[in-house]
Design a protein with these regions (language model features):
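C-terminal peripheral helix-coil segments that are non-catalytic and often amphipathic
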Residues: 1-6, 167-205
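Hydrophobic alpha-helical connector segments
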Residues: 81-110
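DNA major-groove recognition helix of helix-turn-helix
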Residues: 23, 59, 66, 70
Length: 205
């Protein structure tokens, strides 16, 4: 079966949707309970009340499940702000930075003990989506300069800043912790650092 046929079947068959929804719900609950590294496929199938053969019809392993989960959640975050239907403007870039900061913060708050492996997998998935969105924006410009470099630089900058924000609870003397910077203020300070890499490439025709 071709990928397009499989995609069409999944869209039409409510049983496929229901089973995938059960898997995603079970996986989300397990991420909050025990963290990605400790989760096994058996844990997911037990919680979703399906057998392993059914799981493998949807995902090859737990890594593919994590990739799909993060991709879909972040896609909804982008679509909620209609950024996928926009072109480059400083305000749209600001909304994108805000979306990534909020998404990573929520992910770190909701997932138990996010270790390095989990962090790396999430980073790779989200960076691909940021890069695709920035490339889409830049492709609408009149610049003849290849867009790969500015899109890559901006992608790393956005993710790095959002990661810093989501982890920025700094230890103080006596074990107390500082709160994260106020998000709106943080984004306003971060925006020029990212925009400087894009402005010259993003002029509209």
């Amino acid at each position: 079966m071709s990928p397009n046929s499989k995609e069409l079947e999944e869209k039409l068959d409510p049983r496929v949707k229901r089973t995938r929804s059960l898997i995603l719900q079970a996986f989300g609950a397990l991420l909050a309970e025990k963290g990605f590294e400790a989760i096994s496929v058996q844990d997911v199938t037990d919680k979703a009340e399906i057998n392993r053969a059914t799981f493998y019809k949807h995902f090859v392993d737990k890594y593919a499940l994590l990739d799909y989960t993060i991709k879909e959640l972040f896609k909804k975050e982008i679509e909620k702000r209609t950024l996928d239907a926009c072109h480059y403007t400083p305000e749209n870039l600001r909304s994108l930075i805000l979306a990534v900061c909020e998404f990573l913060s929520r992910l770190h708050n909701e997932c138990a003990q996010p270790h390095q492996q989990f962090e790396s997998l999430v980073e790779g998935t989200i960076k691909k989506q940021i890069f695709a969105l920035l490339s889409h924006w830049l492709e609408q410009s009149k610049s003849r300069i290849p867009i790969e470099i500015p899109a890559t630089v901006a992608t790393w900058a956005i993710y790095g800043l959002a990661s810093f924000y989501s982890h920025s609870t700094l230890a103080r003397a006596g074990g107390a912790r500082e709160k994260r910077p106020v998000l709106e203020k943080f984004v306003e300070e971060a925006l020029p650092l990212v925009a400087v890499n894009l402005e010259q490439f993003a002029q509209r025709v």
